[in-house]
């Protein structure tokens, strides 16, 4: 469950007319904080970002799932169901056993995913994949 401050910041960004990706960024930032604080870990920076985006979609941020061919079909379906859950407002009570096992698995993972160097590496790689709008993609 996202914290109240994260929800407040995301709503404020929405009021200011910011893009859904900007609003979702708050949830990703919170996820990185959780990893840094040691609440849990993540296998990779990509996984940490994915968790944040999923939470954003479930919280009702209008961030559509990625298009066909961008990511694996499993990821797309997961994003689709998270998006649908956030938009309909109907939430089933999460299974305690499933939540516990997920958290337990994440606790076993490392904390390197949220370091400055890991985030910088991820940002550079993402910029390189973009065809336009970045110096990194040109270099």
For each feature predicted by the language model, list its residue ranges.
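A charge-rich, low-complexity, intrinsically flexible signal that marks solvent-exposed coils, linkers
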Residues: 1-139
């Amino acid at each position: 469950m996202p914290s109240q401050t994260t929800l407040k910041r995301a709503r404020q960004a929405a009021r200011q007319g910011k893009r859904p990706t900007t609003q979702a960024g708050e949830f990703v930032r919170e996820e990185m904080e959780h990893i840094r604080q040691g609440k849990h870990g993540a296998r990779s920076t990509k996984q940490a970002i994915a968790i944040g985006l999923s939470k954003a979609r479930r919280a009702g941020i209008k961030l559509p799932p990625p298009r066909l061919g961008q990511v694996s079909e499993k990821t797309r379906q997961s994003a689709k169901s998270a998006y649908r859950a956030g938009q309909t407002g109907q939430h089933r009570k999460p299974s305690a056993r499933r939540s516990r096992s997920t958290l337990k698995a994440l606790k076993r993972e490392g904390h390197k995913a949220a370091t400055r160097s890991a985030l910088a590496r991820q940002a550079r790689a993402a910029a390189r994949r973009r065809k336009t709008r970045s110096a990194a993609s040109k270099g």
